[in-house]
Amino acid sequence: ILLKESEDGPWSALTLFFRIVYTPAGRGNALFLYENPNVEESLPNVHNVVLHDNEKMARWLAENFIGALPGPFSESPAFKALQYVPLTECYTSGDTSSKYTQTVKAEGIEVDLIWGQLGTPTALELSPEHVGTRSHNLFNLLIESRDASIVVNGRKLPGQVVPRRQADIDTTTGFVYFSEIWIEP
């Protein structure tokens, strides 16, 4: 979920959630949360954090995936200040046809990623020239959300989803990928 307070303004909050089955660094869950992507700081002032159950995998993602993607996640000041915090709970609720929620908890932190007004699932098969890293084939199921939000400790972060063109598809910045597979050709 990528949020802005106005379509032409800066990013106001960003998240990427991963439920990983295989990487060279193992498996696990990781939530990259940029409560304020525009500042190079983290706890205790701002939740620019990575909540994880496998720090080695989370750092591998930051270095080999997030850091390789051009755009807001690697280029935001928050990326340089991320703190890695072990998660204590990670679960989903809702369904993938109307409203879906991913909840991630850590000591003193509770995050709900909420995708509402879900669109029709679209299967994607993308070659490296259409993928952010430019070095992977990508297979996944994209579901657009026209009303997504990020809630941290009961407080909804500012911003809303905005239009986005992704993989030659008009969608929004409130999308969820399922069954995502990255392959180095």
Task: State what each model feature region is.
Residues 1-185:
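Targeting-peptide/extracellular-domain and disordered-appendage signature
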